[in-house]
Amino acid sequence: MSPQTETKAKVGFKAGVKDYKLTYYTPDYQTKDTDILAAFRVTPQPGVPPEEAGAAVAAESSTGTWTTVWTDGLTSLDRYKGRCYEIEPVPGEDNQFIAYVAYPLDLFEEGSVTNMFTSIVGNVFGFKALRALRLEDLRIPYAYVKTFQGPPHGIQVERDKLNKYGRPLLGCTIKPKLGLSAKNYGRAVYECLRGGLDFTKDDENVNSQPFMRWRDRFLFCAEAIYKSQAETGEIKGHYLNATAGTCEEMLKRAVFARELGVPIVMHDYLTGGFTANTTLSHYCRDNGLLLHIHRAMHAVIDRQKNHGMHFRVLAKALRLSGGDHIHAGTVVGKLEGEREITLGFVDLLRDDYIKKDRSRGIYFTQDWVSLPGVIPVASGGIHVWHMPALTEIFGDDSVLQFGGGTLGHPWGNAPGAVANRVALEACVQARNEGRDLAREGNAIIREACKWSPELAAACEVWKEIKFEFPAMDTL
């Protein structure tokens, strides 16, 4: 009999409601190396003290409920409960604070992002005592990290498979995203790959619709890959979207891709779900396929500053669940992404050990204990004039993906691909020569235009295009 059970047996069960903070607010608690640590941005209802709100978050996301229950006496709450161990005010906000919560590792199933999120970002987000709640960051202990396979292959293995080193990889999303027949779709893939891109991509919306069934798309894209490889002497790939309505159908598509001999498949990991994603990731490792991840639906979860979950948490979850690439914003394009915040979660995707750095939104030091890294993909509203900034911001271990910035070229898809490849090679060469891409970027692109008419035409088309709106998500 546990001490807690013994005590309750002596004094009798006392029904009723008591303040959460009496049990779940423990400012003297010393966190353990095995604890999962969470940083929540909490906005309580008027009149709810910070300690009570923070304790409520810890309780409702672990062992607690709204009233005392007699079965508390059948276990050891001290062993299993979440604890709010620190509260810190948010600068510039009157009624908002960061609540730090520690969760014992035994609360979570091994190797399951699904189970971890069911607790930590579950019903507590609808709790009436809170006006808003946002999960800003998680510290995943190395004891839990080691229960996950992680990315199917990782950055170095991908480079070795592709035999491409010393520069970012280049991609393109085929447009229009919906409506093309499989044969015309395959033609666009071929033209882009022949022009110098490393990858082309299914849009996240492309699954298996009446205008283009998945099997037809896979066949025509495989033909485009092999033909462009034969012409260029480079290894090419197309992200074949295996996302489907069931896990069984998803795996059937991945199996067909492997039988075609293509190097990479794709999954929409948030709409598809973490269970499906982890299943596909395991299949890809076992069968030599790279896995590209799209984050469709992320902004529903992460864009509001006061409620939801920050993308850095979704990025960590993806690294655990498995994926070799993931879309991570561009900083300079059409999609949301403040520079320091973006670089923060890019570090969390790629690096093995990341120190706490609040200037980048990183609340905890994270040790991935050699879990393979994920390549960030910059995609969304980018074109050749952005190439110097993208090369400088993201570095070599990245994919720079131009959809409209390739297919919108006035001379066609292949010249659009040529323009992007020339711009990239010019930026990499200039960087390697010691030139400052941030300061000299436009001059570097203009110099390259002199010996690439394709690049010159692209620069003329997009010279006025800018997406200058303030980021919603700031530190």
From Swiss-Prot:
Record has Protein biosynthesis as a keyword: no
Chemical reaction(s) catalysed: 2 (2R)-3-phosphoglycerate + 2 H(+) = D-ribulose 1,5-bisphosphate + CO2 + H2O; D-ribulose 1,5-bisphosphate + O2 = 2-phosphoglycolate + (2R)-3-phosphoglycerate + 2 H(+)
Molecular function GO labels: magnesium ion binding; monooxygenase activity; ribulose-bisphosphate carboxylase activity
N6-carboxylysine: residues carrying this PTM: 201
Proregion span(s): 1-2
Sequence positions that bind Mg(2+): 201, 203-204
Origin: domain of life: Eukaryota
Quaternary organization: Heterohexadecamer of 8 large chains and 8 small chains. Heterohexadecamer; disulfide-linked. The disulfide link is formed within the large subunit homodimers.
Miscellaneous information on this protein: The basic functional RuBisCO is composed of a large chain homodimer in a 'head-to-tail' conformation. In form I RuBisCO this homodimer is arranged in a barrel-like tetramer with the small subunits forming a tetrameric 'cap' on each end of the 'barrel'.
Name under which the protein is recorded: Ribulose bisphosphate carboxylase large chain
Organism: Pisum sativum (Garden pea)
The gene coding this protein: rbcL
